[in-house]
């Protein structure tokens, strides 16, 4: 049996690090198909922090793609598990036959599925990528993303799988002792990435609540984002008083981020695609309800787990938010499918499928 190779085909340090540490800590000991990785980007101490894994690093997406294609052609029994797929060369290789469908297994991260960029080169490439996606051996994704993907590619196999959010399961049913009265705190977005549409989200929050709430906007990631942070700050100050607007421009350590989320009463996410599952999971765990765009298919996953879902089109006020908090507090969070450790078994299943060990 040829050992499965995992591919992180784009240099996205935060997500790649999360995946590698998850495999090192939770999967590598029990499966030989969870140990070999090809990674676009620099080592940055990952070999040292993930000793159970065999890691090969490549300077860029193109270099990595060339190496993957060479391996695929040299051994047609070799299978690859692509985690997020932001690599144009790999899609083209799948479309042209350089990589065969039975060699190509893909875990959708969300941003790699949706066609939201307005840039010309992306608009031109999307139809090509769509054709390539029809040749994938099997996709793994959230319930909502599977539904979205199946409408375009009904013949491609799909299996439920969740991004391995770093979570302490002992906190699942820990009561949130934050007072549920008085001035509310609203978290806007899950990072400083433009895909969060911060300015539109701030306007939407203001339209719902006016200048009566504390607004927290975490923008410490990605790095070198000062111009956009200033743009968001200026737009925010045109709506909210300085004492109510909190733009966080420094990256927070995990425990500090967790503490920040537990101070919130509501999460507000205006983007129309599935993203930010990690932040959503941590908010739900802390008993904080979330507002989603109705076009974000992750609401299907939340509804399936009997979690309250608020939409950006709903009329929101403190009473609505407090009722959602009450409903969320009554949910047994230890049974939520996309929480740790429940997402582990689907990962074992995904490895068996991608490696050819399960039908």
From Swiss-Prot:
Listed GO MF terms: 4-acetamido-4,6-dideoxy-D-galactose transferase activity; fucosyltransferase activity
Localization, UniProt: Cell inner membrane
Main location: membrane
Keywords: Cell inner membrane, Cell membrane, Glycosyltransferase, Membrane, Transferase
Alphabetized InterPro entries for the sequence: WecF
Protein's pathway: Bacterial outer membrane biogenesis; enterobacterial common antigen biosynthesis
Membrane topology note: Peripheral membrane protein
Reactions mediated catalytically: beta-D-ManNAcA-(1->4)-alpha-D-GlcNAc-di-trans,octa-cis-undecaprenyl diphosphate + dTDP-4-acetamido-4,6-dideoxy-alpha-D-galactose = alpha-D-FucNAc4-(1->4)-beta-D-ManNAcA-(1->4)-D-GlcNAc-undecaprenyl diphosphate + dTDP + H(+)
A GO biological-process term: fucosylation
Pfam families: Glyco_transf_56
GO cellular component, one term: plasma membrane
Keyword Transferase on entry: yes
EC annotation from Swiss-Prot or TrEMBL: 2.4.1.325
Enzyme class: transferase
Primary role: Catalyzes the synthesis of Und-PP-GlcNAc-ManNAcA-Fuc4NAc (Lipid III), the third lipid-linked intermediate involved in ECA synthesis.
Sequence similarity: Belongs to the glycosyltransferase 56 family.
HAMAP family listed in its UniProt record: WecF_RffT
Name of this protein: TDP-N-acetylfucosamine:lipid II N-acetylfucosaminyltransferase
Gene it is expressed from: wecF
